[in-house]
Regions:
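Conserved signal-transmission helix
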Residues: 1-8, 62-66
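Short alpha-helical N-box/ATP-lid segment at the N-terminus of the HATPase_c
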Residues: 32, 57-65
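Short acidic helix/loop segment immediately C-terminal to the autophosphorylated histidine
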Residues: 32-39
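Short, charged, amphipathic alpha-helical segments
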Residues: 43-47
């Protein structure tokens, strides 16, 4: 792969990893606050964190297989 292709792949990977990490960080921060959160919102935030963690794991697995 050319240097340009490597840079594109790295940029795409950076974006693909940062997006779910931002989701995990943001929703975990909300859950860690002491402000009242409804049970429904708490479940939704936990589900989003879980989905983002699965996405990260799949990206890492794909990287390790390359």
């Amino acid at each position: 792969m050319s240097d340009g292709g490597d840079a594109e792949r790295r940029d795409r990977l950076r974006h693909d990893l940062r997006t779910p990490l931002t989701i995990v960080s943001g929703f975990a921060e909300v859950l860690a606050t002491e402000r009242p959160i409804s049970d429904a919102d708490r479940r939704e935030y936990a589900n989003r964190i879980h989905a983002a963690a699965i996405e990260i794991r799949e990206l890492v697995d794909a990287l390790l297989e390359d």
